Amino acid sequence: MAKIVKVIGREIIDSRGNPTVEAEVHLEGGFVGLAAAPSGASTGSREALELRDGDKARFLGKGVLKAVSAVNNEIAHAIVGKDASNQAEIDQIMIDLDGTDNKSKFGANAILAVSLANAKAAAASKGLPLYAHIAELNGTPGVYSMPLPMMNIINGGEHADNNVDIQEFMIQPVGASTLKEALRIGAEVFHNLAKVLKAKGLNTAVGDEGGFAPNLASNADALACIKEAVEKAGYVLGKDVTLAMDCASSEFYNKDNGLYEMKGEGKSFTSQEFTHYLEGLCKEYPIVSIEDGQDESDWEGFAYQTKVLGDKVQLVGDDLFVTNTKILSRGIENGIANSILIKFNQIGSLTETLAAIKMAKDAGYTAVISHRSGETEDATIADLAVGTAAGQIKTGSMSRSDRVAKYNQLIRIEEALAAAGTPAPFNGRKEVKGQA
């Protein structure tokens, strides 16, 4: 038995200079797990609650001392003495103790930090790397794959202080044969993009996720800059590198008039018009994945978008599904989208996250493991991607150590599995829905 003997919570600082929750779980034998909760900027309304103190005298109201107190008191008292290797039981104890539908009593940031720290401690007690322990929890021991990165190299929307409406313009190095090669391709495109932007007299400051955040005349201009960078790096767009976008459409959807208002380029669209606007971009550029291409509540719009684009483009639900099996099951039943973005702080525990990944895969949906715009050096999502053989990961650009920490962990994992004589496959383009 991997007996829990101590649980510690503390307030630390994330990549945006805001507080977040870090937890330690200590086991008999001296094994310790340490994990921190990430935080989003563009958040779905149905996400589990991130508990903030609201005290304007501390961190502009964004302190997390209430959540930390829950870790150090109620949660600690409930799980000390329990077996850390029983992840589902530990998570359920915390969920039941919280007693709310959206984890608003303790905060999903408190419960998740403990959930992940517990998994890390249990892995250490078994002498396993975290990804191997996660594979066992997932019911797929020894089944791994290296994820195809989805690299956000131009930031807009809520992730940047610029005039670009679409939140993320990403590249996927689909022509790579290994994860490490994919990262090299991504880095080379990233550096060439800096040269392209500088030559145009554009800003090369970076946004929350490490991508560039220039002011551009249109969203199509962002794609054109990336195309030029890919070619300058010596790669073929559509063959070696494909494109992906996160529209984060809820951020520019006007609920009063039902229009998608893209103020950066002075255009407004109805739901169907916006789908055809995206369809036009897909015809001009090899865009193979679109995330949140409609408002989170516009299920009719998503159904239409899936009908128009779903057979040729991966349509990822983020704010739409919020890593929640109840909402995902409704989407599956109604043929809405064909992929889910997995952010474990949207749901608030590792067990519930694994359930969402399983439900998606069982239904033929892809699962893209994702960071948040507010991150720490915690690299758990790298192990989650490998341990569930999810196939794709979205963890920012090739700058900012809070992003690169995840890529470096993936390099270590790929290397370790190869050294053990059990290399994990890197399937590249085949991982993207509709691209096999």
Curated annotation (Swiss-Prot):
Signal peptide: none annotated. It is an enzyme of class 4 (lyase). One of its GO terms (biological process) is glycolytic process. (2R)-2-phosphoglycerate binds at Q167, K343, R372, S373, K394. It catalyses: (2R)-2-phosphoglycerate = phosphoenolpyruvate + H2O. It comes from the Bacteria. Mg(2+) binds at D246, E291, D318. Keywords: Cytoplasm, Glycolysis, Lyase, Magnesium, Metal-binding, Secreted. Binds a second Mg(2+) ion via substrate during catalysis. It holds the Pfam family Enolase_N. The active site is at E209, K343. It is found in: Cytoplasm; Secreted; Cell surface. Its EC number is 4.2.1.11. Pathway: Carbohydrate degradation; glycolysis; pyruvate from D-glyceraldehyde 3-phosphate: step 4/5. Belongs to the enolase family. Component of the RNA degradosome, a multiprotein complex involved in RNA processing and mRNA degradation. Catalyzes the reversible conversion of 2-phosphoglycerate (2-PG) into phosphoenolpyruvate (PEP). It is essential for the degradation of carbohydrates via glycolysis. This is Enolase. It comes from Glaesserella parasuis serovar 5 (strain SH0165) (Haemophilus parasuis).
